[in-house]
A protein has these predicted regions:
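Beta-strand elements of repeat-based all-beta scaffolds
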Residues: 1-226
Length: 226
């Protein structure tokens, strides 16, 4: 049998106990030095270690995406991961630990996925590579009007209790959510449901377990259920 039937890891020399290298099980990996290597860096203001600075604002009717340039060098933590096949991925996090950017390298070509937060730290917008490649100007865009965001972006809206009340996926109409006073989802409606004039509903027993679900004919809007 294979003597290396286990996986393993190597820690760095710092007191932070961060993993520097991991090996999968199997002699073929270990004897050939096939491991996943991680370097811990900080961001720069140009090149592969640069990161655009986005934020999101909600005026009650629309979520706006605002790009204000690049983060200054040294503002972000960056992990550079190289897999067993030499493929490189950078992950950028702020000093609160929020993931801001995942950059997958195809040779020297980056493919960026940004996660954009509001001033309360809530995830508002996800920009996959096709969107990030288009939104490169220092500018702002309304998510309801930007064709790029409507086609490629993920957009989230919240109520005053930080519950997701609207979620928009690429190329789709928004999904609406309604909750009860115990923060349990009781109504959900996607674009097709709205066209059909129905809601998906959920009911719970005294222990909070979902026991009934079905379709409720109603053209009532989300705001009127609250």
């Amino acid at each position: 049998g294979d003597a290396y039937y286990y996986s393993g890891c190597v820690y760095g020399n710092s007191s932070l106990n961060r993993i520097r290298e991991t090996y999968g099980p199997g002699a073929a990996w270990i004897e050939n030095g096939k491991s996943v290597k991680t370097e811990y860096l900080i961001n720069a203001d140009s090149g592969e270690l640069s990161c655009a600075e986005f934020r999101a604002e909600d005026n009650g009717e629309d979520v706006r995406l605002i790009r204000s340039g690049l983060y200054a060098a040294g503002e972000l933590s960056v992990a550079r991961t190289t897999d067993e096949d030499g493929k490189v991925v950078y992950t950028f996090t702020d000093f609160e630990g929020k993931l801001l950017l995942t950059r997958r390298m195809n040779g020297t070509e980056p493919h960026d996925t940004y996660i954009v937060y509001d001033d309360r730290g809530r995830k508002r917008i996800v920009l996959p590579p096709l969107a990030a490649d288009e939104l490169t100007a220092t500018a702002s865009w309304g998510c309801n009007s930007s064709e790029v965001i409507k086609k490629y972006g993920y957009v989230y809206r919240y109520d005053g209790r930080d519950r997701v009340i609207e979620k928009k996926l690429p190329g789709c109409d928004p999904v609406h959510f309604v909750y009860d006073r115990s923060d349990r989802l009781i109504l959900k409606q996607n674009g097709n449901n709205r066209k059909d004039g129905v809601w998906q509903y959920y009911q719970y027993d005294g222990l909070g377990r979902e026991v009934i679900w079905g379709v409720l004919p109603s053209s009532t809007g989300r705001e009127d259920w609250e």
